[in-house]
Amino acid sequence: VGSIAIQIAKQVAGLTVIATASRAESQEWCKQQGADFVVNHQNLVEEVQQAGFQQVDFIVDFVDVNMYWDAMVTLIKPQGQIGSISDPVESVNLRALKGKSVSFHWELMFTRSMFQTEDMIRQHHILNQAATLFENGTITPTINQCLSGFSTENLKRAHGLLESGKSIGKIVIEY
């Protein structure tokens, strides 16, 4: 998700992108996806500020809202926006955002269909737009490894790669 988000933020929205990664190969991957800056997530506030940013307008969390909550509260500008797809294990203190008038947005891909919202057709339009961006090369797939043959062996291998914590990009098993 993060790799595509980097591409969309850079190529579609035209934003300056600060990505987080700790390993050298992950940092290089983020740069290849279009990140302007890549910082180590273990010292997030310090790293972002050393990159020349005291605060930022937008933050997107794909990993762990609890782990990075204090850093996000510190780094977000007044009237900024924070988005997250992660599920907090513990409650987060939304009051910490009030003084800065920060907006917090949860995102779940299936909300429109689950609740039959009035704008449900919007999901169709979003997916069509994503397809167009892929087709015209504005954004590119993040496949980094392809395993041939849908088998128990390949499922175990793919799962092992994910569990290793060293996987970058997507792993595809071709049927």
Enumerate the predicted regions with their spans:
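C-terminal capping/lid region of NAD(P)-dependent oxidoreductase domains
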Residues: 136-145, 156-175
